């Protein structure tokens, strides 16, 4: 029998050159009479004979299926090389120019899409009218709809095969960069102080949204207001779970443009991030409940345990991967280029590991990203930190844009129009209930937050309205509805309602959120910056008074966040941070640091060469917000000051300074030396050593500035006296600033600039010697 089978297999491989997947699938049923219609005409009789031979071999069904699988695998390999093979067969020589469209079609079109996304963002942000009317996500959906109409006649999707939505591609390639970039952006004091409120909205609020929305839909269906539908209780629960996912991309963009206060921004941002994780867990539970014959309270209890296990398991895996990445980056001083690889690799490993154990990959990725920003980023260099932040931002932006374009394409380029099987009443009621339930749950939970929790400050009615109105639906809801494996009628009903919810929230609510932010007079971050020093001083005084009262009463209580911070400083940071000491965080008072940042910001805003300091101003803001360690900031300052220093030789310092001031090319060379950015060492091994050497050399050169003065002695003998020239040293330190101002302004202003720079350096020395006096003067000025 095996000899016959081998002969049959060989003959079949030779004769399957024109056989498609449908033809091979037809062979799985030996009694099928339709296999001859899908086979080539010249091979029909041959396959009939071979099929009869298979029947005579007495093969079992499992053996036959295994044989067909091998045949399919062999055929796929043959077809994969068919294009190249045909070209080699047809070509009879060396071709100078050839056309390989089928070989690079998908990759080329995808690359063009990325370029189009970049050009669209450039045009969008330079078009004031479009940016004022529509959010960016709406414009991307419209672009996808236009592309879908262009290929609307292609029923097989062959032209836009790469734009077909696949849930695995979304959850393994498009969603992780978005979640990781969001996790990296959450390192802020406002997020840490409001973590309890954010989790309350994300966990309890999401569950309440699902339960209330499902209950309202069931009641309306039971009463008969919406008519009769073939939707079961579990189908309604699944639909409520998938439309509860919040994706406020447009809202956050408006918040950044308007400049709302940090508390409102991070509450909406953090709630939407954790909301996605809770929504996916609840959706998976609803899918598992559908497979049960009868739902009991015992199954509900198991579902609650599964929810806790999935969430806690993902949290543990994320923390473990974050700790490993932080520990590994302690030893990357000699190989700086691997630092981004370690951070990205461990973060993605946390996501995949959690999914492998059926835990929440989103929770694992959030935990790993937050852990890396607090510990691993303290070990990496400033260039690696900048690379990590920019790479995640670019990938996140591309993935978000591609998701919205795919949403628009699939809206009009489905196998059937989405409105052929949709129910307008069900979709309209779903949209209204999503908005109403969101408002009700937000106001209900905010009442308890304002009454019974120790929040940082009261959440006003205007902010509650914006938080409720900003509950847009997007990519997660769109992806989850495609994963439903119910009957076509049920899936099309849910798909049409989900499309209606996504389009309404993004187009209507996303377009009007900016108007509500302005009309409701939401508290902005700029108003808080004017009194920030006073607020910090007031909070510190209240905290010290509270500690004193607690000591007198004998009852000392610390919040959970403070206890976690103390444990981190005592045990975790010495283990995971490089060169960490207990007094590292206390080397400078908080008020002194904040006052220096405020003074620097005011000086940069009042400087006529403000545009030249735009990059440094951004670095200062990152350091103040905690996104950039101050040690890295000091290294950056060292690098910039080095550009302004000139090694004084034996020639006169004043003459050399005047030549530098008059020569624009020398000034530009001092401000930006292209050879400084080139690293011959690909591993960036000696980066920190170079920075330390530059700082040491700068201090050494400061003592070499001197001038020679000729005097006459008692007996008329001339002699030369060399002494330190402080004015010349200050002039050399100010060369960079003078150069920038000399390019932008006439040369008559250079003397004033020198005097301002000397005054600034004098104030800086006074501040270093008497920091308390500087704080007092700054406070008197602010009052």
Curated annotation (Swiss-Prot):
Keywords assigned by UniProt, alphabetized: Antiport, Calmodulin-binding, Cell membrane, Coiled coil, Glycoprotein, Ion transport, Membrane, Sodium, Sodium transport, Transmembrane, Transmembrane helix, Transport
Tissues showing expression: Detected in the posterior cells of the intestine.
GO CC, alphabetical: basolateral plasma membrane; plasma membrane
UniProt intramembrane stretches: 391-411
Knockout-associated phenotype: Loss of posterior body wall muscle contractions (pBoc), weak movement of tail, weak enteric muscle contractions, severe reduction in acidification of the pseudocoelom and slight constipation. Normal oscillatory Ca(2+) signaling in the intestine with unaffected defecation period and timing and normal locomotion.
Coiled coil location: 649-702
Family recorded in the similarity comment: Belongs to the monovalent cation:proton antiporter 1 (CPA1) transporter (TC 2.A.36) family.
Protein name: Na(+)/H(+) exchanger protein 7
Organism, scientific name: Caenorhabditis elegans
Lineage start: Eukaryota, Metazoa, Ecdysozoa, Nematoda, Chromadorea
